[in-house]
């Protein structure tokens, strides 16, 4: 059986949003905060975890990540405010 995957959104110090997927949100967040996460988030801290969503598998998580990355900033904000 495949592990549960999570989609997450971080808010960076400069107000930008970073979307990613992982099987362990807390561990991945720590990696981002310590500069070992995505290149995009390095130097943009402090970071805030503002949204997480459970996905059934890796494939679903990738699909959802693509959907959210295609959203406008306004739509991402609505998602965070309504569900974050």
Where are these regions (language model features)?
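GIY-YIG nuclease catalytic motif and its immediate N-terminal context
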Residues: 1-84
């Amino acid at each position: 059986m495949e592990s549960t995957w999570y989609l997450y959104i971080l808010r960076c110090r400069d107000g930008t949003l970073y979307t990613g997927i992982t099987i362990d949100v807390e561990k991945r967040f720590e990696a981002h905060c310590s500069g070992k996460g995505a290149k995009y988030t390095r130097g943009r801290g402090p970071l805030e975890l503002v949204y997480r969503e459970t996905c059934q598998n890796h494939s679903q998580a990738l699909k959802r990540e693509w959907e959210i990355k295609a959203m406008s900033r306004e739509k991402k904000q609505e998602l965070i405010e309504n569900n974050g």
